[in-house]
């Protein structure tokens, strides 16, 4: 019970509330963590309906605003996550930074700047087997083209520090968005 009390008082910032980030938000919020800031710039589109929390009934709406209604204690920030925004934003009051960014440049910048308090994820698109989700060093990931791009860019920029990422080792299962042929 002491662990739960300590955990629920954690202050988190979640960057990206798409397919991975929205489910992370739902899981964290429903376990009692309420002090969560969510950051995203996107609006819900029809293609989000089968893979993003909060999308049903909210097509065309700003994601963080719709999620604020679903999870009333979160703090929404509607802004595009860029390297410049990362440089300007004060992350010091957060215990953890949850990285669900799906854009290489800001993701790499965030990792380089804040890798000691980051929990970084890859995407879940085209994957269906939850038993393939792993939490390992970014340098040991495989079968994930997005994380490979991140590794390649980090290496190109001389970043060699160790940190773990959440990713799926499953090979992508479908040819296009929403198609499991």
Predicted regions: what is each one?
Residues 1-181:
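Adenine nucleotide-associated cytosolic modules
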């Amino acid at each position: 019970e002491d662990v739960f009390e300590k955990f629920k008082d954690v202050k988190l910032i979640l960057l990206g509330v798409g397919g991975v980030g929205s489910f992370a938000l739902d899981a964290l919020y429903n376990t009692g963590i309420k002090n969560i800031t969510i950051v995203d710039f996107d609006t819900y589109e029809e293609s989000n309906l089968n893979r993003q929390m909060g999308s049903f009934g909210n097509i065309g709406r700003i994601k963080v605003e719709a999620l604020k209604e679903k999870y009333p204690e979160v703090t929404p920030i509607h802004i595009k996550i860029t390297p410049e925004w990362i440089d300007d934003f004060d992350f010091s009051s957060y215990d953890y930074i949850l990285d669900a960014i799906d854009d290489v440049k800001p993701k790499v910048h965030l990792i380089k700047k804040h890798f000691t308090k980051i929990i970084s994820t890859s995407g879940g698109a085209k994957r269906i087997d939850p038993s393939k989700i792993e939490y390992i060093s970014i340098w040991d990931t495989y079968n994930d083209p997005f994380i490979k791009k991140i590794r390649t860019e980090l290496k190109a920029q001389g970043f060699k520090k160790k940190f773990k990422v959440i990713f799926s080792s499953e090979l992508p299962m479908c040819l296009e968005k929403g198609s499991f042929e």
